[in-house]
Amino acid sequence: MNKILIRNFCTNIKNESTKPLIDNIYKNILKDNFKIVEIKDCKNNRGLFYNPIESPTQTLSVINPKTNKPNLIFKEEPFISYPSIIKSNENICNHCLKEIKKEEEEIKQECEECKVYKYCSIECKEKSSIEYHSVLCKSTGSGFNYLEKHASIEKRRFPLLAGKILARMIMGYHLEKSSKSTWLPLQMLSFAKKPPPLEWKDDYLIFSRSLLKGINNESMKKKFDYDWFVRVMQILYLNTIGIDIDPNQQSTKMSSPESGIGLYLLTSFINHDCDPNAFIHFPDDHTMHLSPLKPINPGDEITISYTDTTKDLVDRRSQLFENYGFNCECKKCLNDLLIKRNK
């Protein structure tokens, strides 16, 4: 395993006292999807498995015979997301990342306070306010716009996602008096145990000056120290997904500067395979849809590709090692390796 990048898990150490807590957090992450999938231990530590409670012996087909359309395993809204930082976002909903078309201009919404953020609907505007914008809005004294400028210049989006995570945690403490629905679920995700690069210190300096100065509660402010920031960045490093909204496009986990980016809690448990049985796509907005590529039997692990499966063995493995810290040993890679050696 790469000494620079190691996949680690906050829940590696398990005992009888922590199991009920972990099971409860998994339940909150699964939500209604517990009827379809389950999180289980596997050779890659943990994975997501097809487990249809209401039809425990039924294979999931690629095409739904009733609608003659591709089947849907489940869909998930992101914990946080952010649009492209190199494309114009003037006509992009700041919440769901959907394009606001000219004919929809009349229903377009904006924040009355900052006049900066635009939304495609009242629903998106309200969700944004409840989840994070009430904390990040310029009218509250937040300096999130300075963090956005920094991220745009340096071409680094993770600090922006970290800012939204901070906002969601503050809103969680404000509305629920706990971190049950915010920080605890994030602790279940794998993270890259890598030495913090020097630029993370620069990012945190801007981050703290932009966002922490507005927090009056000193005990809460201390929660968001540099160690917290590093852990968040490590989580984002392994778990973010590129968002390319296109009803006809299949996506991999990797993002490009042109794409949006998001963190999805349940989807983060899906392991990689170079010959996956499922794929992610974004037909409408930032809501992730998971559909089968091949029939999936009850008990099968659901896998997606983190990289372009049309690339050759060397390119696939190099990309996966560089970005996710593992040497892929799926059946496709082992078979390709055998063919390569026999040539």
Swiss-Prot record:
GO terms for biological process: methylation. Zn(2+) 1 binds at C93, C96, C120, C124. One of its GO terms (cellular component) is nucleus. Zn(2+) 2 binds at C111, C114, H133, C137. GO terms for molecular function: methyltransferase activity; zinc ion binding. The keyword S-adenosyl-L-methionine applies. Probable methyltransferase. Belongs to the class V-like SAM-binding methyltransferase superfamily. This is SET and MYND domain-containing protein DDB_G0292454. The lineage of its organism: Eukaryota, Amoebozoa, Evosea, Eumycetozoa, Dictyostelia.
